[in-house]
UniProtKB/Swiss-Prot annotation:
Protein name per its UniProtKB record: Casbene synthase, chloroplastic
EC id: 4.2.3.8
Cofactor notes: Binds 3 Mg(2+) ions per subunit.
Binding site for Mg(2+) 1: 355, 359
Amino acid sequence: MALPSAAMQSNPEKLNLFHRLSSLPTTSLEYGNNRFPFFSSSAKSHFKKPTQACLSSTTHQEVRPLAYFPPTVWGNRFASLTFNPSEFESYDERVIVLKKKVKDILISSTSDSVETVILIDLLCRLGVSYHFENDIEELLSKIFNSQPDLVDEKECDLYTAAIVFRVFRQHGFKMSSDVFSKFKDSDGKFKESLRGDAKGMLSLFEASHLSVHGEDILEEAFAFTKDYLQSSAVELFPNLKRHITNALEQPFHSGVPRLEARKFIDLYEADIECRNETLLEFAKLDYNRVQLLHQQELCQFSKWWKDLNLASDIPYARDRMAEIFFWAVAMYFEPDYAHTRMIIAKVVLLISLIDDTIDAYATMEETHILAEAVARWDMSCLEKLPDYMKVIYKLLLNTFSEFEKELTAEGKSYSVKYGREAFQELVRGYYLEAVWRDEGKIPSFDDYLYNGSMTTGLPLVSTASFMGVQEITGLNEFQWLETNPKLSYASGAFIRLVNDLTSHVTEQQRGHVASCIDCYMNQHGVSKDEAVKILQKMATDCWKEINEECMRQSQVSVGHLMRIVNLARLTDVSYKYGDGYTDSQQLKQFVKGLFVDPISI
């Protein structure tokens, strides 16, 4: 019996996930002699929806793709955290007073547009810009529209020009990269004299990460500055050296905002000559204040899981409560999004459980039964599931029932349907990967990446997060996500590429589906080294697509788009040196900085 599409059941005219790519504009990218239809409709023509025979097939032998996942490094530590209301109130009172002072500083800067933009950048880097979100949007819009030639008018040096360029682009304003033309010589190369300006070179390096397709000047800027920064960092003053080392390790634009704020506060404090004491105190107090809220929420989430007492029923699954909550905070760290974070955390936990079940334990026959049950979304399916899957299936349906009750009280019960359908589509993608694995099939690269961009969980997590956002009060954002927009696909493709590039060896040792590397090698007849280089270039180009989509007119606000971008940022951080989710040692320092260690006041 064919696995039904829940989305198609509810609306026969609605495009199935596997057919949505046809709605995207065609943008082909060149990679040597290989033309990759990255965002084109041609991928659709190669992608075959699983046939009834395929969906009905089962293995003749019960083969479990058993895997060993290391235990959590945290134990039950976070389930026993205590929250001190008086400590939070003390921070809160001081933050309220300082917030007024900082707003006065922001307003007083408006007489000089460049000074305003630099201050906005400082607030963003310190992690406190969310307090003044509306003011910042209004100020930047006014400056951008009234002073389109701001950099030339003010005769900005390289350091300042790059900050202005980066700030506008990061807020969705497409400032022209031509602002950097004046820093080139008569031969069209960046002036050698710029090498004497370390701060300016660092600023240009950070700005170059906001490039879009076709901006050769930013490609040149990246190569020029990276070469200089890598070779000269050892010769600089200690604090500037730390700035450069951090930027080379993790550029600000592709970093997780909350982690970047933690790092920058320390660097700003060390800059004794230039720091503003009011801004510094405000940032430190606010960081610790918000950290207390995150600790309380992580405790609630950990206790919720512990009280379910399900771990013994699914011992093969990864125990990653702290890392899961790291996902939630990476997307939405601001205090007002507590409910959103809890929804994200529970959904990511469910994704992790089902992913581990299909990927590392279930037989093909069991995977088929689970996929059908998720597609039908009905408790009556329990009787067909093996006992260990019943636990997961009940948790899935019960959790979404809880979401519906909570969101009904907020007038958003309609949003749960979109989350449910996104979950069903995710499991369809998992099932297809299991079929490929079971048949020993290496799919075409285009087919693999298209399906793989969805099985990253990004479309589902994005949808689930929007369910909990109070300012999203209608269907607009959910209907936009349903179209598999280019931002979502580019972010998902980036996550899939980075994930595979760092974890494919370990996963294949336990019989995982072919990775993007295998698919590309098989389709194009290139060596592994060649494939890796090409895929790394594709991952870089994903960021250009992401940047472009955040700077074009959209039915969704830039603020909401950035939450999807944050998932790509999270992957950039978590998979930089391996699978940081599976090996929780790799994320330990980040979890400590977010949830354990406060900033010294």
